[in-house]
């Protein structure tokens, strides 16, 4: 079992936060009948200044999990519960992955901020003609290659894995794609990144550059987890924008404030 929590704000005394954490953990273990040694705990703290998320451990232990595909098959993924802040699979995005697969047959697909390429796997299993995955991290792209292999997807030129700054790559790329998926981080100050990335500040140039690579009849799926995010009016005025949040959030993530927001963006 993976038990995730967010670090309490400074206004909460540490003793109170610890007590609440232990009560919640005990309650979940009791309800699911899980032994303590079967529990993996991850705590996410607010990132600030020049702080960066580092690798947490070096167990190298991966588990195989699966989820339904658009054609009622199974997509298989490697997850790691101990070595990284995240596991390699974002459960809250499973509906978006399925939508991408449903719209990928015979098409060219571009996955930006691809992470471990789970959306790319769904696109490939959905019959995409070609899938390009771009991420700053070679490590995560290698993980993505393993996910492709796990699903029996051949290592061919039709599946590309590109480790590069997304802004730099998309500025120099001249290809057009039928389906584009962008799920950027809220904030990044990676040493490999040129400057910093802030999704609220930088989403307009990011989407505009991506739309330059979108085929005339194509669709760009844009999603992000910044709860206070507001899509700039420039995007709504320039393109046809369809809100998708209510369609893509599963019942187990259906809380008062959506855990993320998503849109389908097309040329007018």
Predicted stretch roles:
Residues 136-181:
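S-adenosyl-L-methionine
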Residues 130-135:
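Conserved SAM-binding motif I beta-strand of class I
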Residues 116-129:
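Conserved SAM-binding loop of SAM-dependent methyltransferases across substrates and taxa
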């Amino acid at each position: 079992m993976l038990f995730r929590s967010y670090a309490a704000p400074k206004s909460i005394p540490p003793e109170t936060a610890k007590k609440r954490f232990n009560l919640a953990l005990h309650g979940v273990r009791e309800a699911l009948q899980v032994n303590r040694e079967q529990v993996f705990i991850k705590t996410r703290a607010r990132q600030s200044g020049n702080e960066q998320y580092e690798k947490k451990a070096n167990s190298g232990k991966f588990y195989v999990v699966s989820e339904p595909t658009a054609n009622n098959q199974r997509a298989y993924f490697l997850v790691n519960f101990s070595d990284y802040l995240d596991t390699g699979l974002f459960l809250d995005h499973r509906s978006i992955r399925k939508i991408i697969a449903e719209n990928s047959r015979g098409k060219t697909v571009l996955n930006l901020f691809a992470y471990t390429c789970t959306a790319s796997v769904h696109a490939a299993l959905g019959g995409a003609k070609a899938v390009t995955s771009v991420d700053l991290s070679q490590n995560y792209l290698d993980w993505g290659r393993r996910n492709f292999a796990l699903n029996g997807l051949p290592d061919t030129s039709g599946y590309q894995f590109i480790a590069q700054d997304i802004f730099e790559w998309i500025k120099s790329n001249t290809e057009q794609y039928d389906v584009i998926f962008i799920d950027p981080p809220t904030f990044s100050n990676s040493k490999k990144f040129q400057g910093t990335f802030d999704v609220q500040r930088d989403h307009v140039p990011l989407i505009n550059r991506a739309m330059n690579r979108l085929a005339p009849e194509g669709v760009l799926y844009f999603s992000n987890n910044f709860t206070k995010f507001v899509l700039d009016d420039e995007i709504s005025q320039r393109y046809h924008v369809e809100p998708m949040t209510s369609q893509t959030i599963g019942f187990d993530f259906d809380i008062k404030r959506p855990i993320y927001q998503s849109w389908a963006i097309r040329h007018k």
